[in-house]
Curated annotation (Swiss-Prot):
Transmembrane segments: none annotated. Involved in pre-mRNA splicing. GO terms for cellular component: catalytic step 2 spliceosome; cytoplasm; post-mRNA release spliceosomal complex; post-spliceosomal complex; Prp19 complex. Its main location: cytoplasm. Residues 147-177 are annotated as: Disordered. Associated with the spliceosome. It is found in: Cytoplasm; Nucleus. Belongs to the ISY1 family. GO terms for biological process: generation of catalytic spliceosome for second transesterification step; mRNA 3'-splice site recognition. This is Pre-mRNA-splicing factor ISY1. Keywords: Cytoplasm, mRNA processing, mRNA splicing, Nucleus, Spliceosome.
């Protein structure tokens, strides 16, 4: 019994080995739906190549002028699905199986087959959708392409307007920050003798010229008042000099008394 069991196990092992070494038929009907079930890098690369072959075949077919518009739409939908499936395999190869980074390589080259289609914002098919071959000449697709071009121009114009507004806003902010940093000393409203700022009534920041004129007028008025006071003092001094002395007063009184006595004898 043990001998028969060993023979059976060896036969089973040989069967598994032959299955693993046998070439895989990478037909699209046999392509696994669960990408993560493939754990060997070589198999994942093979399935990716099979998708590329299918994409190339359908790109040739969608450019055929003999097929109907219905067939063109059908092929275009299939191409979008194939490109999405190809991208999923590329992520699996790079992230899970640590293989080549096809995403980065294809993103930096124009030779990728996906670049043969035009990328359009289509709300019915999803946010973005690609149209290949004759699908780009379909009436509804042409209309969407024109609308997308207009939207891109409007977005560019809005970006330019936003840029201009941001520049103006920066200038205003810069002016405000500069205006806030300028104090009263900048306009000459600082009294160095008293070591203090002048009052707001004397320092009208709105018009420095007016403030200067008011300040100068005040200085002239003060000088004129001082001059008038000096003249008044001089006049007072002169009147004090005219006051008679005691001798003069006595002489005047004697003369006055003499005149009174003489008038009595007459």
């Amino acid at each position: 019994m043990s001998r028969n069991k060993e023979k059976a196990q060896s036969s089973l092992n040989r069967f598994y080995q032959s299955q693993s070494s046998a070439p895989i038929n990478y037909h699209y009907h046999q392509r696994p739906k669960n990408i993560h079930s493939i754990t060997q890098l070589s198999q994942a690369e093979g399935w990716r190549r099979s998708i590329i072959g299918e994409i190339s075949k359908q790109l040739t077919e969608i450019n055929d002028f003999e097929i109907s518009d219905i067939k063109v739409r059908e092929l275009n939908d299939q191409l979008n699905e194939l490109f999405n499936e190809k991208r999923r395999w590329e992520y699996h190869i790079r992230d899970k199986l640590h293989g080549n980074d096809y995403i980065r390589h294809n993103g930096n080259t124009k030779n990728d087959l996906i670049n043969t289609g035009i990328r359009v914002n289509n709300s019915d098919k999803g946010k973005y959708y690609r149209y290949f071959g004759r699908a780009k000449d379909l009436p509804e697709v042409k209309l969407m392409i024109e609308e997308n071009k207009k939207n891109r121009k409007n977005h560019k114009r809005d970006d330019i307007d936003d840029s201009d507004q941001s520049k103006r806003r920066r200038k205003v902010d810069q002016y405000k920050s500069t205006d806030n940093s300028i104090d009263m000393n900048y306009y000459g409203f600082y009294d160095e003798e008293e070591d203090e700022y002048l009052d707001d009534s004397e320092a009208q920041l709105g018009d420095p010229l007016v403030v200067y004129e008011e300040k100068r007028t005040k200085e002239l008025n003060d000088a004129e008042i001082q001059q008038q006071d000096t003249e008044n003092l001089e006049q007072i001094r002169m009147s004090f000099n005219d006051i008679p002395t005691n001798e003069v007063v006595t002489k005047w009184l004697v003369n006055k008394r003499r005149e009174q006595l003489l008038s009595k004898f007459r």
